Amino acid sequence: MDKQDFLAPIIERARRNQVVDPADYIGDDGLLVCGKCNTPKEKILHINDDDIKVPVMCRCREEEVKREEEDRRRREEMERSKKLRSNSLMDGKFWESTFDSFRCTKYNARNLKLCQRYATGFDEMIAKNQGLLFTGDVGTGKTYAAACIANYLLDRCVPVVMTSFVKILEQAQNFRGDEEDRYIRRMNSAKLLIIDDLGAERSTDFALEKVYNIIDSRYRASLPMILTTNLTLKEMKEATDIRYSRIYDRIFEVCYPMEFTGPSWRKVEASRRFEEMRQFLEGP
């Protein structure tokens, strides 16, 4: 089969599918021209010494196809982002946590900037297996900051899992057979793993083994993680229990520490709600 025979059915199909608008016209060169954008809808192919007229897309049709493709890609990304969010294990209350809604104060302004840099530079962070360790008292915004990073990445279709050590250990109680291996593989399918409340787990051999297994598997897979804890760096660095120190050694090797300070947002919010309710019930 020569080139002309090979192209014949393709050209014929293109001719059948070509839409001719009433405003279209024949140009001086004998080719069909679009009546809207005044660019050719046909061209001449030279095949085996023959000149064959074939349909092509005019400029406005090319732009239309490009828009349709962009719309399709956006819809697919939205669906993928929605699916990734549903698989992220993130509590629904954090789905709306974003850098734009982050309440910036003198206490957290620096950390906000660092978290934004981490999120926008995540391609480099994952290449370097670089994670973060958020330390600080209860209510200082550690989990919220981690959720902001998670949502930034999820919006860009980066797989993220966000859970807590307490939840992990609750599930681990029911692991049978190879369920733990499959669970860890699921954790490691995410580009970023965020685990809340390191140190809130019970100090049993079982609990600490599970915590170590999760962190060590992530470490060995060269995948970044963000951990939050109410422990201080001093407490972690001076841990004398070998069960803890081997966990913390892994963390310090791949996680950059950031301390969160300032008043507890939870206490501030509780005080605001109390005063709001007091005024409602008792009057100003």
Identify the meaning behind each predicted range:
Residues 147-151:
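A conserved segment at the C-terminal end of the G1
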Residues 1-109, 268-284:
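A short, basic N-terminal segment
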Residues 99-125:
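N-terminal pre-Walker A segment at the start of P-loop NTPase domains
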Residues 197-198:
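Walker B catalytic acidic pair
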Residues 129-133, 159-160, 192, 224:
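Residue-level preference for the first positions of well-ordered beta-strands
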Residues 124-146:
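Walker A/P-loop nucleotide-binding motif
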Residues 153-191:
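AAA+/P-loop NTPase substrate/partner-engagement loops
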